[in-house]
């Protein structure tokens, strides 16, 4: 049975639909940075997603090639995730999607080294005929956070974020969102197949003691 991050680390991928505090360990990711409306057809965000999956599946299927990754075991590609922010905006203006900056990521198993990653970039670019050079090997140490499972459209996130803010205030914490610690989403539903009102998205915010 292939290793599945969603099942092995349920506390980070399947929170309840009420806020909870977690300490998220350091992990490595495939990452692509960009700016702009994520809904733009053929836009930068959709191109980034194509690059992420091209690299992710090249690594996942590497055991069927001559390239051998030390310590490799079969695994399920983890869910798509995203870190989001807007310049010069207090909070988030969900109506101005073109102002979003983002880092789109997919988690890597710990056995994937930078050398393995570089091999995958070169291989995916060559075999899948897509330029993957914008992908980077990124280590993220999130630390102390509040998270919740948001169910519904992304446009309805503000009400869920309000629940998170109230919860941390009641428990002696404050938001610690800054240029290094960002609004984080993990997409647990396939938006192409599920109705928006059924989308499941983990929302995670960095916090610190008040």
Task: Label each region the model flagged.
Residues 1-210:
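A solvent-exposed interaction/effector surface
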């Amino acid at each position: 049975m292939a290793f599945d991050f969603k099942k092995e680390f349920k506390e980070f991928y399947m929170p309840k639909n009420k806020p909870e505090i977690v300490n998220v360990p350091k992990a490595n990711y495939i990452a692509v940075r960009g700016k702009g409306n994520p809904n733009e057809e053929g836009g930068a965000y959709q191109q980034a997603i194509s690059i992420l999956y091209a690299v992710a599946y090249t690594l996942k299927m590497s055991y069927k090639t001559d390239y051998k990754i030390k310590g490799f075991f079969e695994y399920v590609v983890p869910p798509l995730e995203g870190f989001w922010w807007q310049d010069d905006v207090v909070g988030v203006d969900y109506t101005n999607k073109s102002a979003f900056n983002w880092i789109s990521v997919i988690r890597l198993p710990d056995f994937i080294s930078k050398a393995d990653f570089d091999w995958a970039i070169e291989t995916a670019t060559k075999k899948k005929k897509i330029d993957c050079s914008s992908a980077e090997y990124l280590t993220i140490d999130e630390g102390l956070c509040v998270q919740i499972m948001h169910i519904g459209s992304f446009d309805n996130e503000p009400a869920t974020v309000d629940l998170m803010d109230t919860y941390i205030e009641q428990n002696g914490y404050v938001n610690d969102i800054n240029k290094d610690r960002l609004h984080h989403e993990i997409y647990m539903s396939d938006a192409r197949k599920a109705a928006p009102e059924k989308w499941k998205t983990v929302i995670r915010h960095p916090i610190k003691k008040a």
